[in-house]
């Protein structure tokens, strides 16, 4: 099966390819010559995930004939949010650009991930409730236009400080439920088996069967 993942994020591509396994060939946007910037204007994870999948699907199967020419079976996109209980579910849909939206640049304007993590730790100072969850919404659109949305959630808590050098994004401050280490401290194979994205992709792989 050949699927296009609506992303050029190298970390996400590596993770998704590891999760879905060798039986599914995952193509990046670059590999199908998609160069358009997709503005994530949705107000929910579901809306953003759908927006990305629809934009790429239309490009492959309506605006061009690339989808049919390359025997592509479908397109999928994901949107992930960190939802911190004590902050009313923030940053949620704004997870990737939270610090920039808040004008919070302790590490300089170019250090997006570092600033996001710093803002999470700063916002929870003095609070005992550090419960949080990562939620990933995946939208899959078949070559014939049939659409399905699936979800993966991993509950956990926000650490008191950054720990670990693996992973990306908020991984150094997120401790998954049942573990005493952050995602960034866990082996990649373990993280890929229990993460929110892994659970969403597992749901997708089961639906595809």
Question: Regions from the language model: what does each represent?
Answer:
Residues 2-4, 10-209:
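Anionic-ligand binding patches
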């Amino acid at each position: 099966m050949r699927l296009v993942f609506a992303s050029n994020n190298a970390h996400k591509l590596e993770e998704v390819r590891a999760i879905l396994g060798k039986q599914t060939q995952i193509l990046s946007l670059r590999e199908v010559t998609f160069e358009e910037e997709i503005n994530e204007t949705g107000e929910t994870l579901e809306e953003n995930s759908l927006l990305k999948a629809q934009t790429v699907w239309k490009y492959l199967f309506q605006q061009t004939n690339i989808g049919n020419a390359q025997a592509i079976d479908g397109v999928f996109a994901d949107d992930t949010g960190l939802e911190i209980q004590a902050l009313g579910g923030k940053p949620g849909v704004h997870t990737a650009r939270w610090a920039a939206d808040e004008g919070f640049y302790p590490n300089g304007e170019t250090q997006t991930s570092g600033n996001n993590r710093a803002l999470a730790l700063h916002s929870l100072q003095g609070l005992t409730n550090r419960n949080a969850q990562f939620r990933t919404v995946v939208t899959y659109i078949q070559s014939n236009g049939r659409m399905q949305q699936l979800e993966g959630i991993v509950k956990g808590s926000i650490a008191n400080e950054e720990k670990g050098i693996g992973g990306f994004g908020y991984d150094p401050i997120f401790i998954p439920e049942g573990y005493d280490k952050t995602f960034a401290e866990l082996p990649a194979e373990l993280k890929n088996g229990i993460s929110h994205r892994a659970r969403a992709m597992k749901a997708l792989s089961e639906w595809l069967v």
